[in-house]
Amino acid sequence: MDKIIIQGARENNLKNIFLEIPKNQFVVFTGLSGSGKSTLAFDTLYAEGQRRYLESLSSYARQFLDKVGKPNVDKIEGLTPAIAIDQKTTSKNPRSTVGTITEIYDYLRLLFARVGEQFCPTCLEPISSMSTSDIISQICHLEENSKIIILAPIIKDKKGSFNDKLESLRLKGYVRAFVDGVMVRLDEEIHLHKTKKHTIEAVVDRVVVNNENASRIASAIEKALKESYGELEVEILQDNAPSIRKHYSEHKACFKCKMSFEELEPLSFSFNSPKGACESCLGLGTKFSLDISKILDPNTPLNQGAIKVIFGYNRSYYAQMFEGFCEYNGIDSALCFNELNKEQQDALLYGNGTEISFHFKNSPLKRPWKGIIQIAYDMFKEQKDLSDYMSEKTCSSCEGHRLKASSLSVQVAGLKMADFLTKPIEEVYHFFNDPTHFSYLNEQEKKIAEPILKEILERVFFLYDVGLGYLTLGRDARTISGGESQRIRIASQIGSGLTGVLYVLDEPSIGLHEKDTLKLINTLRNLQKKGNTLIVVEHDKETIKHADFVVDIGPKAGRHGGEVVFSGSVKELLQNNHSTALYLNGTKKIERPKFELPKEKHFLEIKNVNINNIKNLSVQIPLKQLVCITGVSGSGKSSLILQTLLPTAQTLLNHAKKTQSLNGVEIVGLEHLDKVIYLDQAPIGKTPRSNPATYTGVMDEIRILFAEQKEAKILGYSASRFSFNVKGGRCEKCQGDGDIKIEMHFLPDVLVQCDSCKGAKYNPQTLEIKVKGKSIADVLNMSVEEAYEFFAKFPKIAVKLKTLMDVGLGYITLGQNATTLSGGEAQRIKLAKELSKKDTGKTLYILDEPTTGLHFEDVNHLLQVLHSLVALGNSMLVIEHNLDIIKNADYIIDMGPDGGDKGGKVIASGTPLEVAQNCEKTQSYTGKFLALELK
């Protein structure tokens, strides 16, 4: 069958859809937000494909997998195994990196283990093997009369009880052994837990190093090397100090530094294994340590609470000691830390060994001044109590590279593992694409490296091909966006080489500049050409125009959507007269509302920005305007706005002056603002109790209205009676959740509808109180649009609902679980909440890609809302790739010219027309696409 045939799809708002989709083609689902695109693509097609696959497994295998319910559809024919690539599955694991997600790091580990050249991390000399005579010579030349124990490593960090090994050692004549670091006699009973890791070392000899014992030592060494296949340990005993362990090997050693090294294996380069992980940070690359900026305010007088850890409740002892320190060292405590000289600053922080005299509770005391940092540690013995004063910092031992020094010193083609992980993927691709880099390998090494290099090159190319050349393989997976994560997984799928699969993708163009969109489309085409069917939920013009087949769901959102308003080729679509086609063929255009910008111009100037790829940048941002920050992916937009301006401005606005600086970044013009609000795409709540009604505050007004009803007053019900978060009106069986969680132990928890309230969340008595014939549960089940009509005569409620309508969210229900909302919907709910507040006209709003998940019609709505906030005198700063927003902005700041090391600069700024006209001169990609759009 060359088609997927859907009959009677009724999931969520779908209205008994019948649809035929051609197989092995590039299919785009489009339509307004909330029209039912994702329901059809993910909740129907993907869910049924996944369910059928799971049904084919044995009942034993199924019990370990999440159960997928059958979607509400009569029949789907021609369905193939389905893979969903959405944006919600970004990793939260601090050990995940771009390299580990794509498995490129696994191949790099293999390459380094098989053909890597080892160098000593101390002297940087090449490492070579030690012979038996070298080992004997080194040990015999230890300090005269040193007491040593010569050990043969038998078992190293392995699970098991090892009774046979211990018995074998005893029969060979060994009397003692070290078991997990403790010396035991082998003729005694030894019980080892078989599920725990153990280390066993046979004691070959205990001897004093001197000339008389030279032959005895040599004999013991030969015996140990034979017993443990070329390895031995020597424990040097010391009278008044812990013993020292030295490892010797016939395999790898640095003779200059007298150090031996283990044979390389892939685990030697794994930061998730003790064999390769940095011992200081345990492979995380970062450590939590005291942050001086958090325990000390350098601009506050010392006697007015500058040192936060010693001032406050129950800390008078340290405050008195500090006064004594200042008096002894001649420091004026009315000064700020910044006003002290270097010697005084160091003494205050780290101590100077002097004894301080001071009074505490009328008693004279004398104590050494250890410095503020040591005092902080002494005050808070448990590190968790210090969490407020700590920051995550790069590990000083491995410099953030996560591996041991011995692993980081290994080289392939003159580069270390850290070099491959910190270079942009584009550079890594070009490096592996040049075979001359590996011409130094001998024939045997070339044969070993060839298949590994092929796998690395393929995978790196796919990442580069989907527009992610600016990322690094060592980039923490937690810091990549949803769009980047999705494109990484697309690249991985191409590398997998699967055919005959139905791929369902959710807006893969998110976060992608127009320059890279065609690259992405080409990559998707490659996936389709392998014999796969692609269903892409998308709003991007270019992606829609390059599709083989388009399905438009509508005509509106929510209850007014759920129908197929068009299905066919792009050519047929452009001749249609419904909403999507009208925007594509130019009949309808997104235009800004007309209002005059303020004549008096103010700017926010950010100076001395040094972060990621931005070096010593200063930039002016006009206020009381809609300003778009543009640029290709990785050019530095988020670094400038989200990582620099946002936290700095939020901190400084608490005590704003005309010019202020924080961490070297200076901001001029803050006096024109009273607050900075970042409207991100994080969920509005993490539990089923959070919903749009509670978040926007409209729920409070609705509860008050229900409490004012005559029946409610007679029964003495207050507004709290209509809350599902407190006892009184809620259903106590489910505690107002509407569902009951059943723990399934080794299976995922299951949510079942409460059989007492049937999902209504309230008890029957509360549900008897009605407004215009509707209970509180009925109201929560209404869409925003329905509720707006229902509460039209109640201004306090209607005005809040109107803001949700204004941002294009009329289709969501008031009581919709916050965890089911998309990032774009969550962001617009936050925007609606801001719209409903009393405005000061001095707010700076920062938004990151607010058009995510928005149809052209929704973008039009959003643009009106953004400009309405600017019309009130506020400033709007938007990071955006969508040309419909960019061309209607008041001002553009374009970063680039490219991503990664080739970015970090402001290459163009001005009105959209100015940026477009100067695009050839500035080499602005945004300007070039803008020029085409403004024609």
UniProtKB/Swiss-Prot annotation:
UniProt subcellular location: Cytoplasm
GO cellular component terms given for this protein: cytoplasm; excinuclease repair complex
Entry-linked Pfam families: UvrA_DNA-bind, UvrA_inter
Principal cellular location given in the protein's record: cytoplasm
Zinc keyword on record: yes
Domain ABC transporter positions: 310-579, 599-931
UniProt GO molecular function: ATP binding; ATP hydrolysis activity; DNA binding; excinuclease ABC activity; zinc ion binding
Protein name: UvrABC system protein A
Organism of origin: Helicobacter pylori (strain ATCC 700392 / 26695) (Campylobacter pylori)
